[in-house]
């Protein structure tokens, strides 16, 4: 007998994001959708939006933006390797994320980081500089 979750053609957007392991809980997924961090086929949507295979979903996670195409629809949360079979990330998205990570890596290399905390005299000099 086929599993009803596997034969489903439509699933709520928040449930699909949870099942595909973009978010740990459905409530986190719902909050991100309502906050405009998730776009379905180029438009903001609601958590109850029905997800269908072939749809394009844009998800912001931290500093990265991922654009994925839905390959399969599932209501059940599965292991990470099986969850990755539910979608594929677009080439443009992969390229953009790689460029952004390189830029962040180079920025952190050139950012000055002090070797130690400033002592009392150096703190007073910093305060004087900041006041002017």
Curated annotation (Swiss-Prot):
**Is this entry keyworded DNA-binding?**
yes
Q: Where is this region: Disordered?
A: 94-132
One Pfam family this sequence matches: S4
Protein function? May play an important role in binding of nucleic acid. More specific for RNA.
Q: Where is the S4 RNA-binding domain?
A: 11-73
The gene that this protein is the product of is hslR
The record's InterPro entries line, in alphabetical order, gives: HSP15, S4_RNA-bd, S4_RNA-bd_sf
The record's keywords, sorted A to Z, are: DNA-binding, RNA-binding
Q: CDD domains recorded for this chain? A: S4
Name the chain's protein.
Heat shock protein 15 homolog
* Record-level GO BP terms: cellular response to heat
Compositional bias of type Basic and acidic residues: which residue ranges? Answer: 94-105, 114-125
Enumerate the SUPFAM superfamilies for this protein.
Alpha-L RNA-binding motif
Q: Which organism is it from?
A: Aeromonas salmonicida
Q: Which family does it belong to?
A: Belongs to the HSP15 family.
Molecular function as annotated in GO: DNA binding; ribosomal large subunit binding; single-stranded RNA binding
């Amino acid at each position: 007998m086929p599993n009803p979750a596997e034969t489903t053609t439509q699933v709520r957007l928040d449930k699909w994001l949870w099942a595909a392991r973009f978010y740990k809980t459905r409530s986190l997924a719902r909050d991100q959708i309502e906050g405009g961090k998730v776009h379905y086929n180029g438009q903001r949507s609601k958590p109850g939006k029905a997800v269908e295979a072939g749809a394009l979903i844009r998800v912001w996670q931290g500093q990265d933006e991922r654009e994925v195409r839905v390959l399969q629809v599932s209501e059940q949360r599965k292991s990470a390797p099986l969850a990755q079979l539910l979608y594929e990330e677009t080439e443009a998205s992969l390229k953009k994320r790689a460029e952004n990570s390189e830029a962040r890596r180079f920025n952190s290399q050139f950012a000055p980081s002090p070797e130690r905390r400033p002592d009392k005299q150096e703190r007073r000099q910093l305060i004087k500089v900041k006041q002017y």
